[in-house]
Amino acid sequence: MNPLIIKLGGVLLDSEEALERLFSALVNYRESHQRPLVIVHGGGCVVDELMKGLNLPVKKKNGLRVTPADQIDIITGALAGTANKTLLAWAKKHQIAAVGLFLGDGDSVKVTQLDEELGHVGLAQPGSPKLINSLLENGYLPVVSSIGVTDEGQLMNVNADQAATALAATLGADLILLSDVSGILDGKGQRIAEMTAAKAEQLIEQGIITDGMIVKVNAALDAARTLGRPVDIASWRHAEQLPALFNGMPMGTRILA
């Protein structure tokens, strides 16, 4: 069975209640299903808190965080350090054997600089599946942060949705993007069950899909096209629905290729 990549984002990393719900659902799922799981995470809220504490400005361009050279070490520490190890601690608490990684480990995801104006922000491309497949075969849960490294040895901050997409392509995995919201909402706040590229374009033009959600939708569309299968955007808030979601039941917005 294809591995399943669960991309975590939003304020989930900031909420003990949410993490408890998520890891309880993961334990339940792993007990009754053989499907290998991989977690990919960002940690924007962890970074924002740290930047605020250090009085450093947070700038975004087209929904992507601008990462100057003097901030990449701080962001790496927040994502590959604090956020990653927090998730490993929760896995340990729930007796899940997990391994913390970043995109460069085992060359799992190749990263190049996306745009000089964004600074240390990386473009993620599929890499080698060997390391993660080896971990999955031995029963481990890989927990992968969205920090990458270029062939020149430059650390890069990668949008976590795009990192998860590249890793899904690497592993031939299915992908779920877990978010704060129950999916993509229309202008009246109602969840849209299915989304095509044409529909997304229309909603972006109408200003209904904005900011970070544009990046999320484009990443999901890119993933659906790359993987040749649908990708789900759903909420982590309803823990009781997560095992069914992990099993392929649509619970949020299903992005069609």
Curated annotation (Swiss-Prot):
What's the short name of a Pfam family annotated to this entry?
AA_kinase
* Site-annotated residues for Transition state stabilizer: 7, 216
GO molecular function of the protein, one example? acetylglutamate kinase activity
Looking at the keywords, is Transferase present?
yes
Q: Which reaction does it catalyse?
A: N-acetyl-L-glutamate + ATP = N-acetyl-L-glutamyl 5-phosphate + ADP
Q: Name one GO biological process term.
A: L-arginine biosynthetic process
Protein known as? Acetylglutamate kinase
Q: Record's HAMAP family?
A: ArgB
SUPFAM superfamilies, A to Z: Carbamate kinase-like (SSF53633)
